[in-house]
Amino acid sequence: MFVFIAGGGRTGAQLAAQLLDQNHQVRLIEHRRELLGLLHHEIPTEVIYEGIATDPDVLKQAGLSKANVLVACTN
């Protein structure tokens, strides 16, 4: 399954890690630089996309059109 996660806070990061452990394909979008550094230590870099999850260009680059599931973990 291909899961697209908007938001890389605690919930988004934990969800991404669990899904990756279960061999799912994951893309995570986060715009806060302070979280991006932490995320790169928790999940593979190729999963993480820097940007705002409402930006059409970021969504296209991250492959939203191929996703089976979209999870919003935002404030």
Predicted features, each with a name:
Residues M1-N75:
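Cytosolic regulatory regions of ion transport systems
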